[in-house]
A protein has these predicted regions:
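Helix-loop-helix junctions that connect adjacent transmembrane segments
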Residues: 1-59
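Terminal cytosolic tails of multi-pass membrane transporters
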Residues: 208, 214-227, 243-290
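Membrane-helix boundary/coupling elements in multi-pass transport proteins
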Residues: 49-69, 93-95, 127-160, 201
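Hydrophobic alpha-helical segments and their helix-loop junctions in multi-pass secondary transporters
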Residues: 8-33, 212-222, 235-247
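Membrane-interface loop-to-helix entry segments
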Residues: 1-22, 196-207, 223-231
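Extracellular/periplasmic helix-exit of transmembrane alpha-helices
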Residues: 18-31, 80-119
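Helix-loop-helix connectors at the membrane interface of multi-pass transporters/channels
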Residues: 63-87, 106, 114-120, 145-172
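Loop-to-transmembrane helix boundary motifs in multi-pass membrane proteins
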Residues: 81-90, 98-108, 128-134, 139-142, ...
Length: 290
């Protein structure tokens, strides 16, 4: 991981520096919804940019990261620092994507995300950028896939209390996961990504609610996790209600705007229900403690 993380950081610094040196201009982009299907920005954008502002997959890797720390005191520097660093890297790449191609139509025709990264890297950093792009776009996702399969295997084995010491036991759990992975390769990427995005953000929502309960049980300020948990509950609920891969088909021929409004209302109701449930259980816990 250190070498891939370093390549991403070096590439981001190089791209950012290149934008400054070349005095790159970001075109004036109107703050309007450009979705050709007429769908709203919310909640779809919050699912499309999965692993951006919040990520359930990142949450599952926290225990693995924690095992690499020498002391618990390093946790704040590592996790908070990683969060800020990832945000800066995201802003650099957003600026690069907007300025390099000259406008929205050109960016839309540039190709897939991997192609865009390669074009920008080679265009700004030359051959060095191409090598870094190879590490960041090809090698890094491969290691992420490896981590995903390993995490899934360990999660399933732990849930079933199935020991993973013997190599045969590992294969028994891993092979079915590999079969599922191969099957997913035959499904269009944009469909897989939408399901991944929703499941990823749903997992993040669950992690936030777990954090809320954890903080409350220890008498800490749980609002710092409660407000994001409430917001994300609205996001994931309203998305799965209104999205094409969700329950939108049950609304028949209703106008999509009407469906989206209904979905957001349902999301708010679910969020308020979860919040009420938390306060009720938290009050009971306090009474038992007293």
């Amino acid at each position: 991981y250190p070498i891939f993380g370093l390549s991403l950081l070096v590439m981001a610094v190089g791209i950012g520096g290149g934008l400054i040196i070349t005095n790159a201009n970001i075109p004036e982009i109107a703050f309007v919804n450009m979705n050709p299907t007429g769908r709203s920005v919310f909640p779809y954008l919050c699912i499309t940019i999965a692993c951006g502002a919040i990520s359930g997959f990142h949450a599952t890797q926290s225990p693995m990261m924690a095992r690499c720390l020498r002391t618990e005191k390093d946790g704040r520097k590592v996790f908070y620092g990683a969060m800020i660093s990832e945000g800066i890297i995201a802003l650099i790449w957003a600026a690069a994507a907007m300025s390099f191609f000259g406008g929205i139509p050109q960016l839309a025709e540039a190709g897939t995300a991997a192609v865009v990264v390669n074009k920008i890297s080679v265009g700004i950093l030359g051959k060095v950028g191409g090598a870094l792009a190879l590490l960041g776009v090809v090698a890094c996702p491969i290691t992420s896939g490896d981590t995903a399969f390993r995490s899934a295997r360990l999660t399933i084995a732990d849930s079933l209390k199935y020991k993973q010491g013997p190599i045969v036991n590992r294969f028994i759990v891993a092979i079915p996961l590999f079969v599922i992975g191969v099957a997913l390769c035959f499904i269009p990427f944009n469909v897989v990504w939408r399901y991944f995005g929703w499941s990823n953000q749903t997992l993040a929502t669950i992690a936030l609610w777990a954090a809320v309960k954890y903080l409350a049980n220890r008498g800490k300020n749980y609002w710092i996790a409660l407000i994001p948990a409430m917001f994300m509950t609205v996001v994931v609920t309203s998305y799965i209600v209104a999205a094409p891969e969700g329950f939108v088909r049950f609304f028949g021929d209703k106008d999509i705007k009407v469906i989206e409004h209904i979905a957001i209302i349902i999301g708010c109701v679910v969020s308020l229900g979860c919040t009420a449930g938390f306060f009720m259980t938290n009050k009971k816990s306090n009474l038992i403690t007293e």
